[in-house]
């Protein structure tokens, strides 16, 4: 949340307010950004799959129009969520990140996973409902551990084949059923690079709407083992000196914060601000 943005469950039968439109190609934008007068947006020829009330921005109600496909709108274009994270106003990114998670959930829960019947939107809580099964489906949140492994003035960074060319980052992975956060961290580090860790310290968390992760960030000290990269997951992993680092993740990510925080502490620099 921010001073300008708060989430809320709003009834789409309300009138007025602001709205964002999301398609498989991203969010609709014009010269003024991604938040449009709702009445104007609903007059456009959009292929609307569903509508959800998602919160308040600067005191105005905000709604999401989740679209089946992108539509040409004069004076507008489509922009992916990552572009807003890297370049746009961060308050707007918070709105769109939440909208993206709700849109993904709404798109994937149109039908009951038990009986296959259409689900209906509950207007007073964030849930979809199957009346025949009396089953509610809530937005999915996937807990993921992200960890910077440290060894004095060295940090262990790795590359996934999916990364931007040249960029190295921290290790991360999703929790399995029955695991604690610490259990997951130890397992993921062992699986990805075959080293052991100790002195695990929780640092903070960040919502990561790509598509619905909750990143729990840690520092952990190296305890032993030689790096052996996990096939298909890790294409390179090595120790880097805090004085000589490779290209790193985006500054608004918790991965970058874990790195910057440790480096600042080792070098006696100012502690960076946590990405909100």
Curated annotation (Swiss-Prot):
Gene3D superfamilies attached to this UniProt entry: 3.90.79.20, Nucleoside Triphosphate Pyrophosphohydrolase (3.90.79.10)
Cofactor comment: Divalent metal cations. Mg(2+) or Mn(2+). Binds 1 zinc ion per subunit.
GO cellular component, as recorded: cytosol
GO molecular function, one term: NAD+ diphosphatase activity
Annotated Pfam families: NUDIX, NUDIX-like, Zn_ribbon_NUD
Residues engaged in binding a divalent metal cation 1: 172, 192, 233
Residue ranges annotated as motif Nudix box: 173-194
Catalytic activity: a 5'-end NAD(+)-phospho-ribonucleoside in mRNA + H2O = a 5'-end phospho-adenosine-phospho-ribonucleoside in mRNA + beta-nicotinamide D-ribonucleotide + 2 H(+); NAD(+) + H2O = beta-nicotinamide D-ribonucleotide + AMP + 2 H(+); NADH + H2O = reduced beta-nicotinamide D-ribonucleotide + AMP + 2 H(+)
A biological process term (GO) from this entry: NADH metabolic process
Residues of the Nudix hydrolase domain: 139-262
Keyword set, alphabetical order: Hydrolase, Magnesium, Manganese, Metal-binding, NAD, Zinc
UniProt EC number: 3.6.1.-, 3.6.1.22
Binding site for substrate: 82, 125, 138, 206-213, 255
Binding site for a divalent metal cation 3: 188, 192, 233
Keyword hit for Lipid biosynthesis: no
Binding site residues for a divalent metal cation 2: 188
SUPFAM superfamilies: Nudix
Necessary cofactors: Mg(2+); Mn(2+); Zn(2+)
Residues binding Zn(2+): 112, 115, 130, 133
UniProt record similarity statement: Belongs to the Nudix hydrolase family. NudC subfamily.
Quaternary structure note: Homodimer.
Role according to the record: mRNA decapping enzyme that specifically removes the nicotinamide adenine dinucleotide (NAD) cap from a subset of mRNAs by hydrolyzing the diphosphate linkage to produce nicotinamide mononucleotide (NMN) and 5' monophosphate mRNA. The NAD-cap is present at the 5'-end of some mRNAs and stabilizes RNA against 5'-processing. Has preference for mRNAs with a 5'-end purine. Catalyzes the hydrolysis of a broad range of dinucleotide pyrophosphates.
Protein name, per record: NAD-capped RNA hydrolase NudC
UniProt organism field: Pseudomonas putida (strain ATCC 47054 / DSM 6125 / CFBP 8728 / NCIMB 11950 / KT2440)
């Amino acid at each position: 949340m921010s001073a300008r943005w708060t989430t809320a469950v709003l009834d789409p039968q309300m009138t007025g307010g602001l709205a964002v439109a999301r398609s498989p190609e991203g969010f609709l934008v014009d010269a003024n950004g991604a938040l449009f007068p709702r009445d104007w947006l609903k007059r456009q020829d959009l292929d609307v799959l569903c509508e959800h009330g998602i919160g308040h921005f600067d005191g105005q109600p905000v709604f999401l129009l989740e679209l089946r496909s992108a539509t040409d709108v004069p004076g507008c274009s489509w922009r992916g969520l990552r572009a807003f994270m890297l370049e746009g106003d961060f308050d707007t990114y918070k709105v769109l990140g939440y909208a993206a998670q709700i849109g993904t959930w709404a798109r994937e829960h149109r039908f009951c996973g038990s009986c296959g019947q259409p689900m209906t939107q509950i207007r007073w809580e964030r849930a979809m409902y199957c009346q025949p099964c009396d089953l509610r489906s809530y937005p999915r949140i996937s807990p993921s551990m992200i960890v910077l492994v440290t060894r004095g003035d060295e940090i262990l960074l790795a590359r996934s084949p999916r990364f931007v060319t040249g960029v190295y980052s921290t290790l991360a992975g999703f929790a399995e059923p029955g695991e604690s956060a610490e259990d997951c961290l130890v397992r993921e580090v062992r699986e990805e690079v075959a080293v052991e860790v100790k002195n695990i310290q929780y640092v903070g968390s960040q919502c990561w709407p790509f598509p619905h992760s909750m990143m729990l960030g840690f520092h952990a000290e190296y305890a032993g083992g030689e790096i052996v990269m996990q096939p298909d997951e890790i294409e390179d992993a090595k120790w880097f000196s805090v004085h000589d680092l490779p290209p790193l993740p985006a500054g608004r990510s918790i991965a970058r914060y874990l790195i910057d925080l440790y480096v600042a502490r080792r070098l006696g620099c100012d502690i960076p601000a946590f990405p909100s």
